[in-house]
């Protein structure tokens, strides 16, 4: 699914990534942990084509599709790759508060030119699958934090992206809601044969993943089997 080799990222004299190698299989959930400043978010951003590394390669091989090399693409090409291959869930859900759940969720499809009626029907199906039946017409401000994150998960999955990146997806939630949201995230990704990469400080979240990787000073220093 994803293969990264020799990733290097520098910010002036600071080496944020010092030559990282990583392989992620289809249907696998991988957690990346580490102290603040260890390089884990920089790694996620390079893997997800949000920022380019200074050296190295990142290849994505979606089932039934040719392998795509993300490094060396123009910004427009990276943007197109993100839309077609990747989904994103962040600690701050980044939903538009003036829109309802069923209006927020299909936005990636609308950008791809899918007719609004079809996009919203597909979005509503994802919202129901994630336990939000009856809440499709509620504005984001009318939802709890956990419900809003479920909308964000639905939005990340609505295009059928084979690989999802989540940066502290439960960081703003209490422990009970965090567990529920993580269950929804896993059901929507690995439960559908898709891959998931999660950056987290929460050992409980990491323990739900197939593998736990630990970042230290820009290197993946430890790999621990989780479940």
How should each PLM-predicted stretch be described?
Residues 132, 156-157:
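ABC ATPase C-loop
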Residues 66-87:
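ABC ATPase NBD coupling module
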Residues 48:
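Helix-to-loop junction immediately C-terminal to a conserved catalytic motif
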């Amino acid at each position: 699914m994803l293969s990264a080799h020799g990733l290097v990222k520098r910010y002036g004299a600071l080496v944020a990534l010092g030559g990282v190698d990583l392989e992620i299989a289809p249907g696998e959930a991988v957690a990346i942990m580490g102290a603040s400043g260890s390089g884990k978010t920089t790694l996620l951003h390079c893997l997800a084509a949000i920022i380019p590394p200074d050296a190295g390669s990142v290849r994505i091989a979606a089932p039934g599709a040719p392998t795509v090399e993300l490094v060396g693409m123009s910004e427009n090409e990276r943007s197109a790759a993100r839309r077609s291959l990747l989904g994103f869930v962040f600690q701050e859900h980044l939903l538009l508060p003036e829109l309802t759940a069923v209006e927020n969720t299909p936005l990636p499809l609308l950008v791809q030119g899918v007719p609004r009626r079809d996009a919203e029907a597909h979005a509503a199906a994802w919202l129901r699958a994630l336990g939000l039946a009856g809440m499709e017409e509620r504005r984001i401000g009318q939802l709890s934090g956990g419900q809003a994150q479920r909308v964000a998960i639905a939005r990340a999955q609505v295009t059928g992206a084979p690989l999802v990146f989540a940066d502290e997806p439960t960081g703003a939630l209490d422990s009970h809601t965090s567990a529920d949201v993580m269950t929804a995230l896993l059901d929507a990704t690995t439960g559908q044969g898709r891959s998931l990469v999660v950056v987290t400080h929460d050992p409980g979240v990491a323990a739900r993943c197939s593998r736990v990787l630990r970042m230290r000073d820009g290197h993946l220093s430890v790999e621990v089997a989780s479940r």
